[in-house]
């Protein structure tokens, strides 16, 4: 299970540091969204993954939140048609050191996600994709935890 406290602490630390240094923050906090009847505080990391902090576990100051992002709800709306991915237990190492975890769709298509993006979600979770498999949704039994964007790998690199 994701450590909601650690993720929030990392985000606050990064946002505060960015205000001091003037550099762009890696994290963005958005106002609450409701997905499948549950209320979450979306926490976007580098624009390539989103952590959904259940409102009941949120310790984030609403002053840090940007105006709600309707895209978050829209993106998770397409998760309703998502199919479960199978973890192949395979890690592909790219020349630049990035480790990609490989999943398989029910149709045999390989889907790769940067290991660094999904590691904070913890163990014992389920992965889903829909359509063209560009987005990998991450879910516990009852609640969505977030998403990460898939990494495209050329056929000759597989």
Briefly describe each language-model feature range.
Residues 1-158:
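DNA polymerase processivity clamps
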């Amino acid at each position: 299970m994701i450590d909601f406290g650690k993720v929030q602490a990392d985000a606050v630390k990064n946002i505060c540091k960015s205000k001091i240094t003037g550099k762009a923050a890696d994290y963005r906090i958005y106002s609450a969204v409701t997905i499948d009847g549950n209320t979450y505080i979306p926490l976007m990391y580098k624009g390539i993954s989103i952590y959904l902090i259940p409102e009941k576990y949120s310790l984030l100051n609403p002053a840090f939140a940007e105006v709600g992002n309707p895209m978050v709800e829209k993106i998770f709306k397409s998760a309703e048609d998502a199919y479960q991915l199978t973890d192949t237990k395979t890690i592909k190492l790219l020349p630049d050191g990035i480790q990609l975890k490989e999943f398989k769709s029910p149709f045999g298509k390989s889907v790769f996600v940067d290991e660094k993006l999904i590691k904070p979600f913890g163990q014992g979770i389920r992965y889903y994709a829909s359509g063209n498999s560009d987005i990998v949704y991450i879910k516990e039994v009852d609640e969505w935890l977030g998403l990460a964007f898939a990494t495209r790998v050329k056929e000759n690199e597989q």
